[in-house]
Amino acid sequence: MTGVFITLEGGDGVGKSTQSALLREWLEEQGHEVVVTREPGGSDLGQEIREIVLHRRGHIAPRAEALLYAADRAHHVETVVRPALERGAVVLQDRYLDSSVAYQGAGRVLDAAEIRDLSLWAAQGLLPDLTVLLDLDQAAARIRLDAARTRFDRLEAERADFHERVRQAFLGLAAAEPERFLVVDAGWPREVIAAEIRARAHVLIAAGASA
């Protein structure tokens, strides 16, 4: 594959959508084809799965939830991500397998290694070239969410201890793979964050162009 795969990760309320939009604008100005997508919900099937995992009323068993995310990932990678990469596009994706490890692994207290293995199997081993982790204290993130919304999905509505486990899991993943992750303080001004991300993306894309 000749494209570049960039994912944005972090807890709820950290500004992933904002940074994705800013990065897309910059990349398109540089002449790149950019595909912006998300998990769950980056395909027609994924939209249906998203409704179940985020908005269905009532309990979903943690293992069933993990499998639903994996099903979405398998279809999404096969039908959206890989075709875009194969034609040389830059794929900007809101959440990927690291979210499964953090939310279903740490948040739902499932085995993180099993969740990662399941995700890699679903994605046929596809890892991002760059993962941007927007890190923010969960209390500050909650203030942002409360200011922005009146309704919350099933994960956003979880308690503070759930979100703290998720945050620490993300930081652990970044520490384990520093070559793949860029960790940015999501409390910084958005233009400062965008500049950090652009600098790393520029190096990555330039290296690919010269390879």
UniProtKB/Swiss-Prot annotation:
One of its GO terms (cellular component) is cytosol. The keyword Transferase applies. It is an enzyme of class 2 (transferase). Keywords: ATP-binding, Kinase, Nucleotide biosynthesis, Nucleotide-binding, Transferase. The keyword Transcription regulation does not apply. It catalyses: dTMP + ATP = dTDP + ADP. Its EC number is 2.7.4.9. It holds the Pfam family Thymidylate_kin. It comes from the Bacteria. Signal peptide: none annotated. GO terms for biological process: dTDP biosynthetic process; dTTP biosynthetic process; dUDP biosynthetic process. CDD domains: TMPK (cd01672). SUPFAM superfamilies: P-loop containing nucleoside triphosphate hydrolases. ATP binds at G10, G11, D12, G13, V14, G15, K16, S17. One of its GO terms (molecular function) is ATP binding. HAMAP family: Thymidylate_kinase. Phosphorylation of dTMP to form dTDP in both de novo and salvage pathways of dTTP synthesis. Belongs to the thymidylate kinase family. This is Thymidylate kinase.
